[in-house]
Amino acid sequence: MLIEKMHNLTNSKISKFILGLIAVSFLVGGMSGYLFSSNDTYAAKVNGEVISQQDFLNRYNQEFEIRAQREGEAFVAQSDSPEFVTALRQNIVNLMIDQELLRQYVKELKLGVSDEMIKRAIVTDPNFQVKGKFDNAVYQRILQQNHLTSDGYASILRASLPLEQIQNGVANSEFIVPAQVKNSAEVFFQKRLARLATLSLADEMAKQSVSDDEIKTYYEANQKSFVQPEQVKVQYIDLSADNISRNLQVTDVEIAQYYQDNKAQFMTQHLAHIQFANEQDAKVAYEELQKGANFADVAKAKSLDKISGENGGDLGWVNENELPKAFEDAAAALQVGQYSQPINVDGNYHIVLVQERKAQSLENVKAQIADLVRKSLMESRYFSLEKQASDKAFEDSKSLNTAAQAAGVKVQESDYFSRQNVPAGLNFPNVIYTIFESDTTNVGMNSEPINVGDYHTIIVRVLDRKAEGVKSLEEAKIDIETFLKRQKAENALNGKAQQAVKKLSENPESKVDGINFSSEQTFTLSENKDPILTNGIFSIAKPESSKALYQVVHNSNGDVVVVALNKVEQGSLSEKELSQFAMQLLRSHQSELQVQLIQGLRERAKIEVNDSFINQDDEAQQ
């Protein structure tokens, strides 16, 4: 279901497949992508159909906001990076192109959706159900949370359900024959019984020696390997909500006061409504109610919202901020049992009825209020300290000491680092950009406050900078020595292992110095703890007799391993396990087909992307 994809998106679960992402984008961007404006310069053209720059910016801004809410600090920290923004814009335009290709494909196939199909999709969607039954209150709440009306969501379904038909059609066209499942399972769950003789690389390296002449010769022959990137040494202060919140205490008095001042926030109402397309129809129904008509009967007969209308207009229990403000304001002005005059909400007209109203007790919401008060105190304290630190960093621009004192934090200092090994506390794209690219930090002055997440600010100062250059022989000596020792050790171990394999293959009873086999172990691809070792073992031919096969492989530590492969057992699964494996295998194949569909549509399409527009930064487009 499309709404499930939307629900997953708002809960930080992104669809793994391209078509899933495309379906999601209908909800993210609504239908604006198809209401093309002839006055707009294009962002892309797909078989002559224009994706306008305004539609692209709308989709980009919506995706930006959703990801910022979903990913929090991690996203905000990246969002100032030009490389990240360019990649995000490229991703958005590609999704819009894929969406347009599928829209055209739907049109080509003449797929359509009836009103009954839309209604069935809504009432059978598990996201709108409570205990297996459709719940209109849940339905309305989810639409409100996603800034959608019932009509708007129906329009989205009308456009998106054909895409799901295509997706399901592609998926259902793929099948796997039992023999294919059986063969794949036999390999994937195959057991290989082997004994290992491991020759330690670290131990062998410790035995090796390297002369100064060898080091010098290698250095002179491999100058390009010793190019050292630009390095910096910095001081910085780190102000975050975490270090502020530790010292914040919320009293019962503050909680009680907040509850009294914001009682409406903790009020829940049982509401009903009747929805109309225009004011005239709403006024006619209002007159009927004034003359004594039953509210539920009028809702069933006349409400544009057919889902709630079938239940007499019932919307269930609704908390604050779950419905449009105009709707909630109208309800707030009513007494229990009263209905409103027609009100305009997003272009439709509603008559609102308050059926019941009750407040949650202070005890029930105490923990929630404590969090709200604590957050409010933290925000106030954070912004105050951030401003003080910013002012002091500007006034005393060549030291962070006064700024740190104002913020109540310590000045931290790094060792030298390059762009490739930035310390964790500074590893944010906008901080890295400031350190290595900013004119301010290039001359040793304090940076402006850098926002790296919600309530998280860093101010940085570059103490010293080392330009890019080739390491001296002395600087490179340790690395070269280690490399040459490893090279010698690997050659020695591989030679020893190959000799052992030759001798053991000729006579399994031979005793080879330094080759000590472990007890028999079992290896499977399904439990692959060391991919390098396991893949090496599975590269060995299957023994055709009871005689072991010997081969040299390596493990993830770089050790050389002599393998004695004793036996290969084909994997066997129960009917239930085989069925589960078949489903996993099928999903993998279906995923490949879905990607191939998009690739096929792209290959036969004429696609033109306005690269100069897509690759320019946000500020240039304001």
UniProtKB/Swiss-Prot annotation:
Q: Where in the cell is it found?
A: Cell inner membrane
Q: Which residues lie on this side of the membrane: Cytoplasmic?
A: 1-16
Where in the chain are disulfide-linked cysteines found? none
Task: Give the PpiC domain ranges.
Answer: 270-356
Periplasmic topological domain ranges are 38-622
Keywords assigned by UniProt?
Cell inner membrane, Cell membrane, Chaperone, Membrane, Transmembrane, Transmembrane helix
* Molecular function terms, GO-annotated: peptidyl-prolyl cis-trans isomerase activity
Tell me the subunit arrangement.
Interacts with the SecYEG translocon. Binds to the lateral gate of SecY. Forms a complex with YfgM.
What's this chain's function? Chaperone that functions as a gatekeeper on the periplasmic side of the SecYEG translocon. Facilitates the translocation of precursor proteins across SecYEG by interacting with the translocating substrate. Also plays a role in the release of newly synthesized secreted proteins at the periplasmic exit site of the Sec translocon.
Q: Which family does it belong to?
A: Belongs to the PpiD chaperone family.
Name of the protein described by the UniProt record: Periplasmic chaperone PpiD
Species per Swiss-Prot/TrEMBL record: Haemophilus influenzae (strain ATCC 51907 / DSM 11121 / KW20 / Rd)
Q: What is the lineage of its organism?
A: Bacteria, Pseudomonadati, Pseudomonadota, Gammaproteobacteria, Pasteurellales
